[in-house]
Structures are given as structure tokens and as C-alpha cells.
Curated annotation (Swiss-Prot):
Keywords: Cytoplasm, mRNA capping, mRNA processing, mRNA splicing, Nucleus, RNA-mediated gene silencing. Residues 9-228 form the MIF4G domain. SMART domains: MIF4G (SM00543). One of its GO terms (molecular function) is RNA cap binding. Component of the nuclear cap-binding complex (CBC), a heterodimer composed of ABH1/CBP80 and CBP20 that interacts with m7GpppG-capped RNA. This is Nuclear cap-binding protein subunit 1. Component of the cap-binding complex (CBC), which binds cotranscriptionally to the 5'-cap of pre-mRNAs and is involved in various processes such as pre-mRNA splicing and RNA-mediated gene silencing (RNAi) by microRNAs (miRNAs). The CBC complex is involved in miRNA-mediated RNA interference and is required for primary miRNA processing. In the CBC complex, ABH1/CBP80 does not bind directly capped RNAs (m7GpppG-capped RNA) but is required to stabilize the movement of the N-terminal loop of CBP20 and lock the CBC into a high affinity cap-binding state with the cap structure. It comes from Oryza sativa subsp. japonica.
Length: 867
């Protein structure tokens, strides 16, 4: 075999040239083991490390690696004992460093080693019981901290997740002890708090509050119980050890030492706010790995058992995790999982579940975009049609989709189409033109087309929908500037045209910013006022920078001080944004870019941007366009990115300051030591060191001290900037929530006399009442127990009417974005929650506002200003 042992280890279990195209797992293991034996004496240390690395980063192949280690164990017990001991050290380290993925995978690896007779089954039981004991302690009010239930849930999840990989062997070899573990899990399930993840649901529905809906742990426990009743038979987990059982049984099984879990974090206060902050911190450290999104009917699952679905999901997530950044390898492993059934539909559901995972996907959305593209190319006869079906299914439910997920879906879909020549059966969606302008399906198509134009050009996208000419109405205007002082309009005689020409001439003449500011102060403001001056200057500079992004940035860099001088307060900054919006009225992209760049150059404050977004003209667009929300997202994101960057810089400077102090002290010490060495010359003590060396030491000490002072000054400056940034962020949150509350309070329907909260989704009976389709079907909301979906999800052309009134749709969209911002910036909000409770969430605030804001924080709506 020409392939090296490393390649054979990596490709084991795959149908590949290294194994002659064979898919026989037994043959793979024999071939690989033979090569390992030949190379053992020369490469045993490298094999040791590489086997551990493979098990860590190719966890879906752990059964194969376990058998190889088991076979080596027959010849060299020390090698396998070292594997076991190193695994124990790695698991102990992962527990104390809260490395979630490593804990989960190492427990699976232990099960793989146990199946191959390398680890004693009783040791696995002891490990499980240690984790269960820690989980139960965390939930104890006196000795633990129930706010940290996510950590306890994670420990139990790790146990449950490893059982498909070793439950059968534990049941056969240590049945009584294994039953004790299962009883302990049942006991834990009975005392834990049910987790209602409505804040993280992709779809907004009333069913999300159903007490019968299982959370992720309850669902996984049910799957394991079904597996137990079926005799622990799992089709999705390879069992290569069974082919070598007669050999492996002769090996010596090693004991896995007991583990210790980190003690629970004790709560420092009984305050509900502190408990909420602790729970939020726990959720961040131990997030739920997957929230299932059932897109397709269950008959697409190839008769997959509940636990098989879970195992394949885990394998898909592992590949996505470890091959992030290696897209080709990622696609290869995704399509070649060692399972005996087709799983394209499940793979699509899992990837879309990650893309739409709230509050954030594990990786940047572009990663999932590239993975889907590569899978379409790797499986051209199967996966593209699966993606089409998924898009149609999600589109059918777009009206109930979370606003953040809707935005991600728009961005993904437009990018995906750009890689396939923008080909899509648009005629199937042509009916959306006849829906109200606020209908979510119509807005979705409109926003996708707008994003496509950003990625291409107007005429190309117009051509792509030629089979659905009705949709041309949804295309944005052809992008181009709207210069108020254009010379072709025949209005050159006006003051604005004349002054604009003068300004252009000054820019072309390379006049300095000071010269132009003086010209504005002398020629425009005294005669026409500051607002007119801002109008002329901003329109003209925007026109000069309109050729490209680079031109715009150059103009802002060179002449930003002129705009800054004209916009000393928020009132003038609001006018500046009006000018930007007027100039680029035909280009949402350029408005967003210009405002974002102006904020970057501090020509616009984040508070001014929030006020502008919540101005009447923009508020009226909340439900029909993403334009105001994109600008608001950019402003809030940039604010917190600055703070994040400053914290990183401060952390680096603190390390640098410590190093500078040590260097300064060392240089000073060397200088003093040199000076202290004296000798007697003519009866007088004089330094014995060479004067030249003393001068060098003095210079080095001075330079080191100077470096220390410089670093300390830089640190103080950055800390001052951070303090200012934190204060600005506090004001931003105050204004943001105040603005949401004000506009929503004005428009939300009042509570009834009986105290009933209005149902916004009931809709206006006068909207599309004659066009409603009683046969219209929708996809079931994602439920953890894998219930059947009622809808037909093969991408048929189904006309779905919209029966929600415009006011109700506006309220739904705005409440959705309030929830989205609360969820996205929950960490920052929790640090200022007392202020928000006292100033914003007070009085008779509408319960729908409180629900949206608090659900984003995973905070009970009963909490608030009384705390």
C-alpha cells in the first residue's frame, strides 16, 4: 500500500483510493493496522499523538480508531494505557476549562475504547456518575446555583449523547450499574427546570408556549428511552469492533481514573437581576448546540429511528465544527458519513438549523453559504433539489419567522443564487406582487432582489426574472445619484448651483479644509444660513465621492472636518442623514455605507442615527423595507465592536505594560549592580566598570523606562476611551429602548377591558378576505420530538394570501426587531438592566412591549421595575 499511515488513519471508513475504493470496514481496519504495525517502532510517538488528534477532530470515526487502539493493545499494553491516561488528563483539563466540545467528544472516545476492550466498563459508569452528581449539586439551592442549570444540562447531555456509541456494551457487561445511571438521569430530569426556548425559536407561534413541548434534554432522554426499549440497536453508529471481538477480548482493559468536576458557582445575591445575569452567563458558556428545524416531512428520513437522527445530526455538526475553514474537506466528509442510509434531507435541515440558530450561529453565516454551495456541487443529482424544497418550505412560513432569521435567510438566499447565475423559478412566486406591500412574502422577494442587485447589477437581475415579469414591480429603482445641483437641470443661476460649482472648483484646485471652511463661513452661512450650507456642502461632496466606495472614503477623509464643522449637534446630524438619504434615494446600499462611514469618522453619533431611524419617515417603512433596520443594526454593531476592540487593545497593553515594567526593572537593576562594583584607586573608591559600559547600561535603562511610561500613557488613553465608549453605549441602550417603547405605544392596539392582550396575528378581516385559501398549508413549527409536518414541502406553486392588516404587521415587525436587539445585545443590556427598569420598563407599559424585550433576554415578563 503506497499510502502513508497518516493518510490511512484519516481516510479510514471512507470509500477512497487509499483503500482501493472498498467500503468494507473490516478490510480498512486490517489494512491500516498492518501499516501501523510495520511503522510502529519508527513512529510510535507520532502515532500516539496522531491517533488522539484524529479521535478529537474526526469524532464520527471514533469506532474505527477505538478498534485500532484495541488491536495495538494486544501487542503493547503501555501504548493503550498511555492513550487512556492522556484521555483522562485531557478530559479533566476540558472540564475545568469548560471546553464543551472536547468534553463531549472525549466521553464518546471513552465509549469507543470501552467497546474495544481498552477501558473497563465500570470506569465509564464512574465517570457518568461523577457528572450526574455534579449536575444534581448545581441544581441544589443550598450547595449549588440553579441559575447555572445550563452547565448541569450539558453534563447530562454529554452522557446521553455518548450512549448510542456504547450503551449496548454497557448494558451487556454491567447491566446493574448501567441501570443505576439511567435511574440517576431520570431523577435529574424530574428535578430540573423545563427550558422554554421561545426566545430562540425560528418561528413566532402560540404553540411555543405549550407546556407539552419537550426541551432539548427531555427530547434526547426520550430518544434514549426508545433506544433502550429497542435493545440499544443503532444503525447510524458503526460497530467495527464486532468483527474483531474474538481478538479484542484477549486484551487487558485499563482503568480510567475518577474525574472531578469544577465546583458550582455560588450565587452572590438573591436579587432577581443577579440571578438573571448569572443565567445569561451560563447560557453563553453552555449554549444549546442544536435547535431542530423540521423543514421536511418525516417520510424523507429514510425510516430513520429517533436516535439515528440525533447521531447523524451530531456527526454533521462535528464535521462543520472541525472543518470550518476547509470547505472542500468539509463537503467531502459531510457526504461520506459512515451511515447505511441517505441523509440529504437531514443534512439540509441541520445546516439550515445552524444558519438560523439564535442568538448567533456558531460560525459566520458565509461559512454555511459556502458549505451549501459545495454540497450542491458534490451531490448535483440530489442536494440542489433538497435546497429548493427547503427554501420553498421556509418561504411558506416567512410571515411567522423571527426577524433576525428572516434577515439571515435573505442574505443567504441572495448570495446562494449569485453562485448559480441567479437562476430560480421566480414564476412560482409571482403571485406576491398582488399581496399587500407589507406582506412578509412580498417583502422577502423584494429584499432578495435588492440584495442580488448589490451582488451583481440591475439589468442582470431584471433579466433573471424575465419569466416572472410581474416581479419587476418589486425591483428597486435603478441605482444612481440624485444630485440636487446637477448642471443639466438649467438651474445654474440659483445660489445652490453657483455655490456648488465654486466648491467643486475649490476641491479640484486642492484647497485645504481650512480654506473651504473659511469660504463656507464667509460666503454661505451669513447669507443663506447653516442648514443651506450643509445642504450645498453635503450634496456636492457626496456627488464628488459618488463614483465608487473608494471615492466616498477619500472625500470623507479629506473633507470630513468641513462636514463636522457644519454638524456640531444632533439636529444638524439628522439633517445630514436626510441629505444622504435624498442623494442616494435610489440606493439602499449606498445610504447604509455612507452613514456607516460617517459614523466611523465620527461625523455622525450613534445617538443621532437612532433618532433618525425612529423619525416618522423611517418609522413608516419599518414593515415594508429593511433599509432603516440595516442602518440601525450597523450603528449598534459598530458601537459595541469599538468597545470590544478597545477591550482587546487594553488587554494587550496591560500585558505589554507588565513586560515593560519587568524590562525597566531589570535594566535599572543591572545599572545599579554595575555602579555598585567599585575599586580603590589612589585610596579613593571609583567604579570598576568600564565607563562605556556604564553609559550603555544607563541608556538602556532610560530607554526601558521611557517605554514603560509610553505604554502606561497609551493604556490610560485607551482606558479613557473605553470609559467614554461604555457611557455612550449606556446612552445608546437608553435611547434605543425608549424609541421602541414610544413608537410601539403609539400604534399597538390597547388592552381590552377584561385585560386581554390583543392578538396581532388575528389580522384585519377586511384584508384579502375574498382571496383567502382555506386549503393553504404551512410547515409545522420545529418541535423536538420530530412530529409530522402537515404541509406539502416539495416546492409546489401554492398561492398563500396574507390576512394581517398593515398596522398589525407594522407592530409585529417592530416587536420582532425589539426582541432581536434584546437578544443580540443581551450581555450589554443585562449590565444596565437596573437603569432600564427604572427609566424605560416602568408604569403601564404595554405587555407586548415587555414580552418582546424580556423574551429576548430570557427574562420572565413578571419581572421589571419592582425589582
Amino acid at each position: 500500500m503506497s499510502a502513508g499511515w497518516r493518510t490511512l488513519l484519516l481516510r479510514i471508513g471512507d470509500r477512497c483510493p487509499e483503500y482501493g475504493g472498498s467500503a468494507d470496514h473490516k478490510e480498512h481496519i486490517e489494512t491500516c493496522y498492518g501499516v501501523l504495525c510495520r511503522e510502529y517502532e519508527h513512529s510510535k510517538d507520532a502515532m500516539f499523538e496522531f491517533l488522539l488528534q484524529c479521535a478529537d477532530q474526526l469524532p464520527h470515526k471514533i469506532p474505527f480508531f477505538g478498534v485500532l487502539i484495541g488491536l495495538i493493545n494486544l501487542e503493547n499494553e503501555d501504548f493503550s494505557k498511555g492513550i487512556v491516561d492522556t484521555t483522562h488528563a485531557n478530559l479533566q483539563d476540558a472540564l475545568h476549562n469548560e471546553n464543551r466540545d472536547r468534553i463531549r467528544i472525549l466521553l464518546r472516545f471513552l465509549c469507543g475504547l470501552m467497546c474495544s476492550k481498552v477501558v473497563l466498563p465500570n470506569s465509564i459508569i464512574e465517570t457518568f456518575e461523577a457528572l450526574l452528581s455534579s449536575a444534581a449539586t448545581i441544581l441544589d439551592e443550598e450547595t449549588g446555583n440553579p441559575s447555572w442549570q445550563p452547565r448541569a444540562d450539558f453534563y447530562v447531555y454529554c452522557i446521553l449523547a455518548s450512549l448510542p456509541w456504547g450503551g449496548s456494551e454497557l448494558f451487556e457487561q454491567v447491566p446493574d450499574e448501567f441501570e443505576r445511571v439511567l435511574v440517576g438521569i431520570q431523577s435529574y430530569i424530574s428535578i430540573r427546570r423545563h427550558f422554554d426556548d421561545i426566545a430562540f425559536s425560528v418561528f413566532e407561534t402560540d404553540e411555543g408556549n405549550s407546556p407539552n413541548k419537550k426541551d432539548f434534554i427531555e427530547d434526547l432522554w426520550e430518544r434514549i428511552q426508545v433506544l433502550s426499549r429497542n435493545g440499544w440497536k443503532v444503525k447510524s453508529v458503526p460497530k467495527p469492533h464486532l468483527s474483531f471481538e474474538a481478538q479484542l477480548v484477549a486484551g487487558v482493559s485499563h482503568r480510567f481514573s475518577p474525574i472531578s468536576c469544577p465546583p458550582p458557582t455560588i450565587s452572590q445575591s438573591s436579587s432577581e437581576i443577579v440571578k438573571g445575569q448569572e443565567k445569561h452567563e451560563a447560557d453563553l458558556k453552555y449554549p444549546q448546540r442544536l435547535r431542530r428545524l423540521h423543514i421536511f416531512p418525516t417520510n424523507k428520513a429514510e425510516n430513520m429511528q429517533p436516535v439515528d437522527r440525533f447521531v447523524v445530526e451530531e456527526c454533521i455538526l462535528d464535521v462543520l465544527l472541525f472543518f470550518n475553514g476547509c470547505r472542500k474537506e468539509c463537503a467531502f466528509y459531510l457526504v461520506s458519513l459512515p451511515v447505511p442510509f441517505r441523509y440529504e434531507y437531514l443534512m439540509a435541515e441541520t445546516i439550515f438549523s445552524q444558519l438560523l440558530l439564535l442568538p448567533n450561529p456558531p460560525f459566520r453565516p458565509i461559512y454555511y453559504t459556502l458549505v451549501i454551495i459545495d454540497l450542491c456541487k458534490a451531490l448535483p443529482g440530489a442536494f440542489p433539489s433538497v435546497v429548493v424544497g427547503a427554501v420553498h418550505a421556509l418561504f411558506d412560513r416567512i410571515s411567522n419567522m423571527d426577524m433576525e432569521c428572516r434577515t439571515r435567510l435573505i442574505l443567504w438566499f441572495s448570495h446562494h443564487l449569485s453562485n448559480f447565475q441567479f437562476i430560480w423559478p421566480w414564476q412560482e412566486w409571482a403571485y406576491v406582487k398582488d399581496l399587500p406591500k407589507w406582506a412578509p412574502q412580498r417583502v422577502f422577494v423584494q429584499e432578495v432582489l435588492e440584495r442580488e442587485i448589490r451582488l451583481s447589477y440591475f439589468d442582470k437581475i431584471k433579466q433573471s426574472i424575465e419569466d416572472a415579469v410581474e416581479l419587476e414591480e418589486l425591483l428597486p429603482p435603478k441605482a444612481g445619484p440624485n444630485f440636487r445641483y446637477h448642471s443639466d437641470e438649467g438651474k445654474e443661476s440659483t445660489d445652490g448651483h453657483r455655490l456648488s460649482k465654486e466648491l467643486v472648483a475649490m476641491v479640484r484646485g486642492r484647497k485645504t479644509q481650512g480654506d473651504i471652511i473659511s469660504w463656507v463661513d464667509e460666503k454661505i452661512i451669513p447669507v443663506n444660513g447653516a442648514k443651506f450650507a450643509l445642504d450645498v456642502v453635503s450634496q456636492t461632496l457626496l456627488d464628488i465621492g459618488s463614483k465608487s466606495f473608494t471615492h466616498l472614503i477619500t472625500v470623507l477623509e479629506r473633507y470630513g472636518q468641513i462636514i463636522s464643522k457644519l454638524c456640531p449637534n444632533e439636529e444638524m446630524q439628522l439633517l445630514l442623514m436626510d441629505e444622504v438619504s435624498a442623494y442616494w434615494k435610489n440606493s439602499t446600499q449606498m445610504i447604509a455605507i455612507a452613514i456607516d462611514r460617517m459614523m466611523g469618522y465620527r461625523l455622525l453619533s450613534n445617538l443621532a442615527i437612532v433618532k433618525w431611524v425612529f423619525s416618522p419617515a423611517n418609522v413608516d417603512q419599518f414593515h415594508v423595507s429593511d433599509r432603516p433596520w440595516e442602518i440601525l443594526r450597523n450603528a449598534v454593531s459598530k458601537t459595541y465592536n469599538r468597545i470590544f476592540d478597545l477591550r482587546k487593545e487594553i488587554q494587550t497593553l496591560r500585558k505589554g505594560l507588565q513586560a515593560a515594567k519587568e524590562a525597566s526593572e531589570k535594566a535599572a537593576r543591572e545599572l545599579e549592580e554595575a555602579k555598585s562594583i567599585i575599586e580603590i584607586v589612589d585610596g579613593q573608591p571609583v567604579p570598576s566598570e568600564n565607563p562605556g559600559r556604564l553609559r550603555r547600561l544607563q541608556a538602556r535603562a532610560d530607554k526601558a523606562k521611557e517605554g514603560e511610561v509610553t505604554t502606561e500613557e497609551s493604556l490610560e488613553a485607551k482606558e479613557a476611551l473605553l470609559a467614554r465608549g461604555l457611557e455612550e453605549s449606556k446612552e445608546l441602550l437608553r435611547l434605543l429602548f425608549k424609541s421602541f417603547v414610544e413608537v410601539l405605544t403609539e400604534r399597538l392596539p390597547p388592552i381590552s377591558a377584561d385585560g386581554d392582550v390583543p392578538n396581532l396575528r388575528a389580522g384585519d378581516p377586511n384584508v384579502n378576505s375574498s382571496a383567502r385559501d382555506p386549503e393553504a398549508t404551512t410547515m409545522e413549527i420545529d418541535n423536538e420530538n420530530g412530529g409530522d409536518n402537515d404541509s406539502q414541502l416539495n416546492g409546489q406553486n401554492k398561492k398563500i394570501s396574507h390576512n394581517v392588516g398593515e398596522l398589525e404587521q407594522w407592530c409585529l415587525c417592530t416587536l420582532g426587531y425589539l426582541k432581536s436587539f434584546s437578544r443580540q445585545y443581551a450581555t450589554e443590556i443585562w449590565s444596565h438592566i437596573a437603569m432600564l427598569d427604572q427609566e424605560i420598563f416602568v408604569g403601564n407599559i404595554h405587555p407586548l412591549i415587555r414580552k418582546a424585550a424580556f423574551s429576548g433576554l430570557c427574562r420572565p415578563t413578571s419581572e421589571g421595575s419592582h425589582l
